[in-house]
UniProtKB/Swiss-Prot annotation:
Pathway: Amino-acid biosynthesis; L-histidine biosynthesis; L-histidine from 5-phospho-alpha-D-ribose 1-diphosphate: step 7/9. This is Histidinol-phosphate aminotransferase. It catalyses: L-histidinol phosphate + 2-oxoglutarate = 3-(imidazol-4-yl)-2-oxopropyl phosphate + L-glutamate. The keyword Amino-acid biosynthesis applies. GO terms for molecular function: histidinol-phosphate transaminase activity; pyridoxal phosphate binding. The modification N6-(pyridoxal phosphate)lysine is found at K222. Its EC number is 2.6.1.9. SUPFAM superfamilies: PLP-dependent transferases.
Length: 360
């Protein structure tokens, strides 16, 4: 086969082991998955009720425009419906963005470490990837990113809060950054974890009307608890949305996914409860980290913590796994002596912390 040259050296995504597989291997009767930043509280009771009572005509294609969901989300954020695009998770939106803006003559700027799919999709398109190391505290080096932009740059990625460090860039700094980015360079502000930030930042969706080169990406996979439904969306100027729709598959979000997302966004009381529970979980880890001088906890603003114990990441990962907790080894994330742990329920956090204390 005459494969694209840009695929040379790239590897496919390797999912972690299934919980059942890990239990069988280690002889465990229970395992808790804290590796994929899923919502430990599940999803809204309204979503659960819809799931229990919904019947979907599986032989009928879904609404390719996601009309009902589009109206609800537009009303929620006070946007025009044409300022939205819906995709099969933010993963698909990242793919569409790289497809319309990157090729072998272009480059893209991002932090490192950050969400790996920016880099992967850029390389698939054959583009040059310019990675700017995070600052010592895990924050984006925004000045360094600005300096990396040239005439061939078409996309700049800002993951906020950043995955895997959890650092959050406040709105004033985002605006100052946007003021300096050339108007023909798209800034992707990936806010997959924005609903977890405490206290919540002021509404800023209106920025797309000031900065015509901005797209804000969000998802129903995290705090809304719909990871398997695969519904993400982008907020941007209509001209950007029009270009993305050219390459968007016509029926890319499912009927049930659209319906579940509508119920999910309506239940903001559940979202507030999730945000409070998550903030309390972060405090548990902060209290733990303060007791041990060798422990470094990166600023946590998502639903996970990146914690450096000064111990080889694989050792930490295997130790927690053998004790019934699947986490994410920092070795694959650019942090060789750290692990990323999803914030769980209070008792789950306490159990993991107790195990880490024993390891230290």
């Amino acid at each position: 086969m005459k494969w694209k040259k840009s695929l040379t050296g790239l590897s496919s995504y390797k999912p972690g082991k299934r919980e059942e597989e890990v239990m069988a291997e280690l002889g465990l009767t229970k395992i808790t998955k804290l590796s994929s930043n899923e919502n430990p509280l599940g999803t809204s009771p309204k979503v659960a009720a819809l799931q229990a009572n919904s019947s979907v005509e599986t032989e009928i294609y879904p609404d390719g425009w996601a009309s009902s969901l589009r109206t609800v989300v537009a009303d929620f954020y006070q946007l025009d419906e044409e300022e939205l695009i819906f995709t099969a998770g933010v993963d698909e939106l990242i793919e569409l963005l790289t497809r319309v803006l990157l090729d072998t003559t272009k480059n893209t700027v991002m932090a490192t470490p950050t969400f790996v799919q920016y880099r992967q999709n850029a390389l698939i398109e054959g583009a040059e990837v310019r990675e700017i190391p995070l600052l010592v505290d895990g924050a984006h080096d925004l000045d360094g990113m600005l300096n990396a932009i040239d005439d061939n740059t078409t996309i700049v990625w800002v993951c906020n809060p950043n995955n895997p460090t959890g650092n959050y860039i406040d709105l004033a700094d985002i605006q100052a950054f946007l003021d300096k980015v050339p108007s023909d360079v798209l800034v992707v502000l990936d806010e997959a974890y924005i609903e977890y930030v405490t206290p919540q930042p002021e509404k800023h969706e209106h920025l797309i009307r000031t900065y015509k080169n901005l797209i804000i990406t969000r998802t129903f996979s995290k705090i809304y608890g719909l990871a398997s439904a695969r519904v993400g969306y982008g907020i941007a100027d209509k001209a950007i949305i029009e270009q993305l729709n050219i390459v968007r598959p016509p029926f890319n979000t499912t009927s049930i996914g659209q319906k579940l997302a509508i119920e999910a966004i309506k239940d903001q009381a559940f979202i507030e409860a999730c945000r409070t529970s998550n903030a309390n979980g972060i405090k548990q880890y902060e209290t733990f980290a303060k007791r041990f001088e060798q422990v470094k906890l990166y600023p946590a603003n998502g639903n996970f913590v990146l914690i450096d114990l000064g111990i080889e990441a694989g050792t930490i990962f295997s130790y927690l796994e053998k004790n019934g907790y699947i986490t994410r080894s920092g070795a694959a994330l650019g942090f060789p002596t750290a692990v990323r742990i999803t914030i769980g329920k209070e008792e789950e956090n306490s159990a993991v912390i107790a195990l880490l204390e024993k390891l230290l």
